[in-house]
Amino acid sequence: SEWLQSLAALSPDAVVATGDFLSHVEGISSALEALNPLMDFPGVFVLGSNDYYAPKPINPIRYFSGPSQITPSRPMLDWEPLVAGMTAHGWHDLTNAQVDWKVAGRLISVKGVDDPHISRDDYAGITRSFNAAADLALGVVHAPYLRVLDAMAADNAQLILAGHTHGGQLRVPGYGALVTNCDLDPKQARGLSHHRSCALHVSAGLGCSRYAPFRFACPPEATLITLTPRSSHLE
């Protein structure tokens, strides 16, 4: 919590939060307290599956057979106060939505979806297109499933920001992630890559399941991204 709060000292122009703020029925106040210094800056957010459902024990080997599944035995979390707390500070809720976002004198057209990991995404239902007059077309999603990345790329997104993968959580030195808990290639589990015509950045995030509270060769992270204008004179 203290480390997350200390990130405000970086004075970012804006904050993009890609979900999984919670994992416990009593986690809302702690999450909002940790985010409070960052909420002094403009922000947008989406939710992840752990904001809707409490985690349960799972055999880690299960992840090698494909993405984990949400079962009826996982209790629902009271996520509405979390959303209310962030929007009260002026952050934009990107749950299957598009917003035009003024940041540091620039216009960013942003489209986000609810978490594809639990099939709450509805990109086709976002009736507003990216603003053609914007300086940047930005897509935001928690779990970087290919169906959403494909839709955003086809919609002319220039940059997509995602989370969910924990960077693989357990990485093999010299090789990288073994799993992503979605259908994204493990080689793209962390950091900057490309998907079709747009840049993709997947954050390894800060935490992990309380039932698997460890990482290996994959430290928690928050990423400070600097965007620069593309020169029309580049050869």
Describe the residue ranges of each PLM region.
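Active-site metal-binding loops of divalent metal-dependent hydrolases
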Residues: G19-F21, S49-Y52, A97-Q98, V113-P116, ...
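Short, Asp-centered acidic motifs that coordinate Mg2+ and/or phosphate
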Residues: D13-A14, V44-F45, I108, L136-L138, ...
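Binuclear metal-dependent hydrolase catalytic cores centered on His/Asp/Glu-rich metal-binding motifs
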Residues: I58, F64-W91, T95-A97, V103-D150, ...
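Short, conserved loop/helix-junction motifs that constitute active-site signature segments
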Residues: L10, L35-D40, F130-A133, M152-D155
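Core catalytic region of metal-dependent phosphoesterases/phosphodiesterases
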Residues: E2-K102
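Short acidic-hydrophobic surface loop/beta-edge motif
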Residues: A97-A104, A189-H195
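Conserved beta-sheet core of the metallophosphoesterase superfamily
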Residues: P144-T223
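Short beta-strand-to-coil "C-cap" segments at the C-terminal boundary of structured domains/repeats
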Residues: I225-S232
